[in-house]
Amino acid sequence: MTKDFRQNVFQGRSVLAEKDFSAAELEYLIDFGLHLKALKKAGIPHHYLEGKNIALLFEKSSTRTRSAFTTASIDLGAHPEYLGQNDIQLGKKESTSDTAKVLGSMFDGIEFRGFKQSDAEILARDSGVPVWNGLTDEWHPTQMLADFMTVKENFGKLQGLTLTFMGDGRNNVANSLLVTGAILGVNIHIVAPKALFPTEETQNIAKGFAEKSGAKLVITDDLDEGLKGSNVVYTDVWVSMGESNWEERVKELTPYQVNMEAMKKTGTPDDQLIFMHCLPAFHNTDTQYGKEIKEKYGITEMEVTDEVFTSKYARQFEEAENRMHSIKAMMAATLGNLFIPRV
């Protein structure tokens, strides 16, 4: 019998949601991302996907995800092809299944950023190639690889740290943080109004993983309880893409703004405390949105104050850069025929 030397526990797998991966697998991808970042900084080529063609499907617009997948593909020696909302017809003029079969016959891998998690799952099922979820309404796994890579880069470890998310506890980033932290043994606190707590289904998924990893999960509307002992304070926009209920959210979430008072509530020494945000952030009035919010609601900052955003705690731009390195690791591991027989 001929031995297959292309042993790889990731080869051919799609990355649709964090819950599909073990703690060891996620940590491997995070560490691989740190390794590829070091290679990039040292100018050492790593063309693991030479000759591959990558489809980048975007129903939702993007700055960081598109840029990260494009540069990651090129660094790996692959050719990325962008297909925007005017180029793809998922479920409109062509079924998602039919689109998957066509793209799978032409491309070696597919990134999908859109609304429905079911579309990502159909693409993965019917394309025959790895599909990477660049964001859906439910989950944001590529953001999580970058986020926990950033945490490990700053603290040298993951297990036993505490991350507090403040804001809309039902959005995809909060869902993914809760579940990924639970898998990795990171304590996750969600601080939000009761009406915006994560769904019971999401909480149950996270609790199942936390029982194995020892992660402590806290979901509360009390800032003091949620922030105490935190190493990472994390927030996201108050209104997600596709939503329009600004007035309601501003009223609900203003008490959950990340400001210096919130950072102090952690009681954590400065050298053990960072702030993170997946971006874009409404921290001043330098944008059209920022100006409109000021005119309508009389506030100049939303989910985070400019003071925190520009402070010594801020790591959001490292986090944004790490999107590229972590996505590169994920793509190479799942498509590059690398030798990864176990993790």
From Swiss-Prot:
Alphabetical list of InterPro entries matching this protein: Asp/Orn_carbamoyltranf_P-bd, Asp/Orn_carbamoylTrfase, Asp/Orn_carbamoylTrfase_sf, Asp_carbamoyltransf_Asp/Orn-bd, Orn/put_carbamltrans, OTCase_ArgI
Binding-site list for carbamoyl phosphate: 62-65, 89, 113, 140-143, 278-279, 323
Pathway note: Amino-acid degradation; L-arginine degradation via ADI pathway; carbamoyl phosphate from L-arginine: step 2/2
Subcellular location: Cytoplasm
Keyword terms: Arginine metabolism, Cytoplasm, Metal-binding, Nickel, Transferase
Amino acids binding Ni(2+): 79
Cofactor binding: number and manner: Ni(2+) ion bind each monomer of the trimer.
GO CC, any one term: cytoplasm
Listed GO MF terms: amino acid binding; metal ion binding; ornithine carbamoyltransferase activity
Subunit structure: Homohexamer; dimer of trimers.
Function summary: Involved in the catabolism of arginine. Catalyzes the phosphorolysis of citrulline, the reverse reaction of the biosynthetic one, yielding ornithine and carbamoyl phosphate which serve to generate ATP from ADP.
Similarity comment text for this entry: Belongs to the aspartate/ornithine carbamoyltransferase superfamily. OTCase family.
Protein name as it appears in the record: Ornithine carbamoyltransferase, catabolic
Organism: Lentilactobacillus hilgardii
